[in-house]
Amino acid sequence: MENDDITVAEMKPKKRAGRRIFKETRHPIYRGVRRRDGDKWVCEVREPIHQRRVWLGTYPTADMAARAHDVAVLALRGRSACLNFSDSAWRLPVPASTDPDTIRRTAAEAAEMFRPPEFSTGITVLPSASEFDTSDEGVAGMMMRLAEEPLMSPPRSYIDMNTSVYVDEEMCYEDLSLWSY
């Protein structure tokens, strides 16, 4: 999709919300995004012909919800979609069909690509102390395996690897001092 064909929300300002509740919850910039429970953002779009709502999910950030919205409107409206981000047309996946479940699944996958690290759901499980074998046999076995493994030579330096570069070694170490006073 060409960038000239894209309509970005910045170029087409949103209409003012009529009801007070929507004034308080909807995002001031992003289309199709509103706040729920203070710290969560939800997203939904309407199908162009049937006017049925397609629920896209709840997200920790407004940016993620806006990306989900962009995936859905690209699937439903194609080139006439009004996007929240100008790079969404080439950066985000477009669902294979206009089925609401397919749109929802693709929108969730696209939003996950933009999940900030502080909202990561990855859980690191540390082993308990009982899982470590600290007995003499365990340590001795580990030492024997290390002794049997072949020694590896240290990695070559950059200068040794790159033979096309001429380097005057005296010039490299001219201002290098071993001691700082």
Curated annotation (Swiss-Prot):
Q: Which UniProt keywords apply?
A: Activator, DNA-binding, Nucleus, Transcription, Transcription regulation
Q: From the record, which residues define motif Nuclear localization signal?
A: 14-26
> What CDD domains does its record include?
AP2 (cd00018)
What Pfam family does this protein match (any one)? AP2
Q: Name a biological process GO annotation.
A: regulation of gibberellin biosynthetic process
Where does the UniProt annotation locate this protein? Nucleus
Which residues does UniProt assign to DNA binding? Answer: 29-86
Similarity section = Belongs to the AP2/ERF transcription factor family. ERF subfamily.
By what name is this protein known?
Dehydration-responsive element-binding protein 1E
What is the scientific name of the source organism?
Arabidopsis thaliana
The top of its lineage is: Eukaryota, Viridiplantae, Streptophyta, Embryophyta, Tracheophyta
